[in-house]
Regions:
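Radical SAM enzyme core and accessory elements
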Residues: 2-5, 40, 53, 62, ...
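N-terminal [4Fe-4S]-dependent radical SAM core
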Residues: 9-12, 139, 143-188
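Glycine- and acidic-residue-enriched helix-capping/strand-helix junction motifs
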Residues: 12-28
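Conserved C-terminal portion of the radical SAM core fold
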Residues: 38, 63, 91-93, 225-232, ...
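Short acidic active-site motifs
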Residues: 51-53, 102-103, 270-274, 312, ...
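Non-catalytic positions within long, well-ordered alpha-helices that form the structural scaffold/packing
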Residues: 57, 106-107, 222, 279, ...
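Radical SAM [4Fe-4S] cluster-binding motif and immediate context
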Residues: 164-325, 332, 344
């Protein structure tokens, strides 16, 4: 069969980090790897080229598979609609994060099958059935229109599949992670045992770590053509012994790459010597979720770290000469004094890069119930659920004042914390220009949000 795998274009009105962190569609690369031997298959990344109609006309796929993030629902449905308009015989499949979290959002006249989770087995079973045109029985993880979207109800999660990165060869020079461009991504471990209250990732991947064999990891690293790799494990720094073995293998194989990873404060402070060694083995930056200056909020979020731990982690990274790309969460109960305390806290931590998002109670999270009465978004306003919009009504200041405080914080980060000089020193002037273009787009979005609230 001919299969076209599609990543939808960016949702324009969403405020996301996409301008700074633009990763390969690795889920589609995994599907490609499973199906490539028996089918003719290609990937269309609509974030780079918006050529769906041309592909439908020239490639003439029998199946179009569309991946999704939480904010993509309407975009996926509109792609499905366009596909069926052009050729109603094309089979349309939806999958991705949103399908796992909110399956029924894809129950749509133009979508034939929805993958709640993807495994080698369910991919092969479905495509065998589609090819043979035999009656479609229920398959684990797949909800088909012909079966009224029923499935076997067997619980499952996405299987770890080694992606075929050649499938995105023509796009790869575009993928970047902040100043590292081109940059590949890979996963060396699934799940997370930290179980933070606000986090979707461990709920999607599992409540404890499932580490991939390091030989398999090393083989992938050797195969990756890019000089920079972002490990998108939930907490790459979790296991000291595994990290030491990782460093051994990097040294034995003379691998010289730039690595970026997510790492928890708890892991950084529990094995500082290993963190230093990782720095010598190529670890350039760690994305750390410090979240807040408030001890109470850290406890409420069920973070396993304290404010003091945050300072310790920051010091360890600086001593190891590893950049810290910090992320924070803005609590809806903050007032202007809290924002001021927050700015002082960030100034003391002095991360090289600072990102933030307002606390977002996604419908699948327990905290959704807690904030249900203060929600500013409806569940079906899918595009609005981007991490940067205020979704909970602030309790102590007005919404427009809250947006004003966010704007003040953005200016504080850019003008006072010298992010610009870090960018130039680390990545050069052209990267600063590229990133600044993204920031410039974000600033008016917040100004617009603030003014909209004032008018209403
Ligand atoms: S450490 Fe990170 S990935 Fe793990 S549960 Fe907490 S926020 Fe989620």
């Amino acid at each position: 069969m001919k299969i076209l795998l599609v990543r939808p274009p960016r949702v324009k009105q969403a405020v996301t980090l996409g301008e700074f962190m633009f990763c390969e569609p690795i889920g589609l690369e995994m599907v490609y790897a499973v199906l490539m031997d028996r089918h003719e298959i290609k990937i269309l990344d609509m974030m780079i080229e918006n050529t769906l109609e041309k592909e439908l006309e020239t490639f003439k796929p029998h199946v179009v598979g569309i991946t999704s993030l939480c904010i993509d629902v309407n975009m996926v449905k509109s792609i499905a609609c366009k596909v069926k308009e052009i050729n109603s015989g094309i089979i349309v499949i939806a999958g991705g994060t949103q399908a796992f979290l909110n399956l029924s959002s894809f129950y749509d006249i133009n979508i034939d099958h929805v993958f709640k989770y993807t495994t080698r087995d369910n991919l092969n079973l479905l495509f065998d059935a589609l090819e043979s045109k035999k009656e479609l029985h229920l398959i684990d993880g797949i909800h088909s229109k012909v079966n009224q979207y029923r499935s076997t109800n067997v619980f499952g999660r996405n299987e770890y599949i080694i992606p075929n990165r050649l499938s995105t060869q023509k796009y790869r020079q575009h993928y970047s992670y902040l100043g590292y461009k081109p940059c590949a991504i890979m996963q060396t471990s699934l799940g997370c045992s930290s179980n933070c209250d606000f986090c979707l990732r461990w709920r999607i991947e599992g409540a404890k770590e499932n580490d991939i064999d390091l030989e398999c990891v090393m083989n992938q690293i050797k195969d990756i053509q890019e000089d920079s790799i972002m490990f998108y494990d939930n907490n790459f720094l979790n296991n000291r012994d595994r990290l030491e073995k990782f460093c051994d293998l990097i040294e034995q194989n003379n691998i010289v790459k730039n690595f970026i990873c997510y790492g928890s404060v708890k892991s950084i402070i529990s094995h500082p010597e290993t963190i230093k060694r990782l720095g010598k083995c190529g670890l350039k930056a760690v994305l750390v979720g410090y979240e807040t200056f408030s001890e109470k909020e850290l406890a409420d979020y069920k973070k396993k770290s304290t404010v003091e731990d945050n300072y310790k982690a920051s010091k360890i990274l600086k001593e190891a000469k590893i950049d810290c790309w910090a992320s924070f969460m803005l609590h809806p109960d903050w007032d202007t004094k809290d924002f001021k305390n927050f700015r002082s806290f960030v100034k003391k931590l002095k991360p090289e890069i600072t990102t933030f998002c307002p606390l977002t109670p996604f419908p699948n999270l327990p905290m959704y119930q807690k904030y249900k009465d203060r929600l500013l978004l409806r569940i079906e306003d899918y595009e609005m659920w981007s991490f940067s919009k205020v979704s909970i009504k602030p309790s102590k200041i007005s919404l427009s004042r809250y947006y004003f405080e966010i704007l003040k914080f953005i200016l504080f980060v850019n003008l006072r914390l010298n992010s610009a000089s870090y960018m130039i020193n680390r990545f050069g002037f052209m990267t600063l220009i590229r990133i600044t273009k993204g920031s410039i787009k974000i600033l008016p979005l917040y100004i617009k949000l603030m003014l909209e609230v004032r008018k209403s």
